[in-house]
Amino acid sequence: MKTLYSLRRFYHVETLFNGTLALTGRDQETTGFAWWAGNARLINLSGKLLGAHVAHAGLIVFWAGAMNLFEVAHFVPEKPMYEQGLILLPHLATLGWGVGPGGEVIDTFPYFVSGVLHLISSAVLGFGGIYHALLGPETLEESFPFFGYVWKDRNKMTTILGIHLILLGIGAFLLVFKASYFGGIYDTWAPGGGDVRKITNLTLSPSIIFGYLLKSPFGGEGWIVSVDDLEDIIGGHVWLGSICILGGIWHILTKPFAWARRALVWSGEAYLSYSLGALAVFGFIACCFVWFNNTAYPSEFYGPTGPEASQAQAFTFLVRDQRLGANVGSAQGPTGLGKYLMRSPTGEVIFGGETMRFWDLRAPWLEPLRGPNGLDLSRLKKDIQPWQERRSAEYMTHAPLGSLNSVGGVATEINAVNYVSPRSWLATSHFVLGFFLFVGHLWHAGRARAAAAGFEKGIDRDFEPVLSMTPLN
């Protein structure tokens, strides 16, 4: 092994303690990257990099299949999904598999099938990953030019981008077809407390679909997270799928314009940074969606949202005290505002008390009791159905506020259940992972821009003490 400490080419790279473990083409001497730099060693080995990506996909799909089967094995049909710490079965149930009216699970076999299909797929991907990592050609450019590429080849890069966009568009249309033709999906707004139905009358009006993008992200506006009917969600997927497929065709057929060639950095690390930035945005949006939206993420499976649990508590005690003779329309609370009902800043009748801050909540168990000016007093007195009472009492005790010791629910609610809501897990994990991805985006963007500018910031290794010391071996 050459003594790396004197090779200026690697002056910015940490050195391996034991170079004898390395393989040619993947070691520090031949690539300039040590083993822990992972796929950086494969930057110019398209065949090996393909193997790494396929194997990674295999690991992802293996986790999905194994975790799916684990959740099926532990599932208890008598308890709601959100009380059982499930994060995969709620997604399958939302797609309409295995559930009936009210979100009740009537058949777990589709969940089992899903797990097995993912496990089989992961085996295929795993084999492909190992083949390309160990046996296949190191580079694809010579044998399979269609799959080969050079990072600086702008035309090839936008062609690859186009192929990816088409695949994403097909994915969006798969949801459209499932919702419209293949059995439908679960609609939490179906009359009487939710059911599986086919979504046929899609919203395709561009003013409605793109109106969501123009809404404020704050308060009762809520940007795209405020979507509350499946026609809009599935119609949005028609638009997105179409845009992705048309954009993909465009990027395959065209070469980048001069402004794009000048403005963007065209290197492997730059593409990595762009991808990490996009994933960070996805993570932050997913966090807000699963935390606030009870249409795409039905409360029957994921548990109530925070505002929903709070409003459910107010509703439950309104029902109780009204039965005990309270006049809920005029009773005053300790602050002089209405104890059960009050008016919002814009005049609607809303629940009183601390839950006033959540007055713009919309939930399927509550909307039937609203009139043109907010909550309708006559409906609250005469029209409350048993299923609405049951559901609000259940949601009241399952707020997504799990603390460190897993005591779920509102802290002052003596009936709160000992659990952590899947909404808490999914929102927190997607925020944290989105943040890590964002930091990775900044890191790799900085490195890519520095490399493109012809310098690499870092510790000046020319005068490091270690350079004058005896090599370890």
Swiss-Prot record:
User: Which parts of the sequence carry Phosphothreonine?
Assistant: 15
Superkingdom of the source? Eukaryota
Q: Does the UniProt entry include the keyword Transmembrane helix?
A: yes
One GO CC term, this protein: chloroplast thylakoid membrane
Q: Does the keyword Cell wall biogenesis/degradation apply?
A: no
Q: Which residues carry this modification: N-acetylthreonine?
A: 15
Q: Which residues cross the membrane?
A: 69-93, 134-155, 178-200, 255-275, 291-312, 447-471
Residue ranges of coiled coil: none
| Swiss-Prot/TrEMBL GO biological process terms | photosynthetic electron transport in photosystem II
**Could you tell me one molecular function GO term of this UniProt entry?**
metal ion binding
The protein depicted here goes by the name Photosystem II CP43 reaction center protein
* Topology term for the membrane: Multi-pass membrane protein
InterPro entries hit by this protein: PS_antenna-like, PS_II_antenna-like_sf, PSII_PsbC, PSII_PsbC_sf
**What residue ranges constitute the propeptide?**
1-14
Keyword terms: Acetylation, Chlorophyll, Chloroplast, Chromophore, Manganese, Membrane, Metal-binding, Phosphoprotein, Photosynthesis, Photosystem II, Plastid, Thylakoid, Transmembrane, Transmembrane helix
For the ligand ([CaMn4O5] cluster), the binding residues are 367
Q: What does this protein do?
A: One of the components of the core complex of photosystem II (PSII). It binds chlorophyll and helps catalyze the primary light-induced photochemical processes of PSII. PSII is a light-driven water:plastoquinone oxidoreductase, using light energy to abstract electrons from H(2)O, generating O(2) and a proton gradient subsequently used for ATP formation.
Family indicated by similarity: Belongs to the PsbB/PsbC family. PsbC subfamily.
Subcellular location(s) of the protein: Plastid, Chloroplast thylakoid membrane
Return the cofactor note field: Binds multiple chlorophylls and provides some of the ligands for the Ca-4Mn-5O cluster of the oxygen-evolving complex. It may also provide a ligand for a Cl- that is required for oxygen evolution. PSII binds additional chlorophylls, carotenoids and specific lipids.
| Assembly description | PSII is composed of 1 copy each of membrane proteins PsbA, PsbB, PsbC, PsbD, PsbE, PsbF, PsbH, PsbI, PsbJ, PsbK, PsbL, PsbM, PsbT, PsbX, PsbY, PsbZ, Psb30/Ycf12, at least 3 peripheral proteins of the oxygen-evolving complex and a large number of cofactors. It forms dimeric complexes.
Organism annotation: Cicer arietinum (Chickpea)
